[in-house]
Amino acid sequence: KNPNDVIGEFLFLISNLYSSQDNFEKSNFYLNLSNFLNPKFLFNLSLVAENQYSNKQYKKAKKTLEKFKVEDDFYYWYRIKKEAQIISKQRNKKESLNYITAEFAKINEPNNKVIFDIANFYKNSKEYEEAIKYYTKIIDNLDDISEMKADLLYRRGGSYERIGIYDKADEDLLYALKINPDDAYILNYLAYSWL
């Protein structure tokens, strides 16, 4: 591997650290160095777009996102999600949801990550029935004791609770707690729902 590539990837990690602390000036400094040394490293562009989005530079973020092409499934889905988030900020959640669901419908065989993301978009848009449908698709294909299943049961249970189906909400939350008995979020949600 080219030494510049390795150094560029290391600088990306530093940039990401600063970005996670909302220090975008330093993040962008290290990101520019990383980009200079390793322009092929696509993670750089995703962090550029993320920093621009966090700074409400939506026009710049959209331009950066255009570099992610449909041929690269992972980055293209990242682009779609980020564009939907921008639509939500600039217009409204309904248009954002319409955009992402239209793009989702074009995917022949979405993987669990994509299905998870679309479920979360529905949940965040208060479209709980649709969120439940997609969470269920993933839950049905997971091992009974996976921590991921516990998280999905928590999310689906919360969606059931929001639409007043309390018995199914409790069932999901108790099952999630059985898988992951120390999860404070699940314990808190159950305690709150029983009040």
What do the predicted segments below correspond to?
Residues 24, 58, 93-94, 128, ...:
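TPR-repeat structural position
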Residues 39, 73-74, 108-109, 143, ...:
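Short coil turns that delineate tetratricopeptide repeat
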Residues 27, 61, 96-97, 131, ...:
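Single-residue signature of alpha-solenoid repeat helices
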Residues 21, 55, 90-91, 125, ...:
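Structural motif corresponding to the intra-repeat A-B loop/turn of tetratricopeptide repeats
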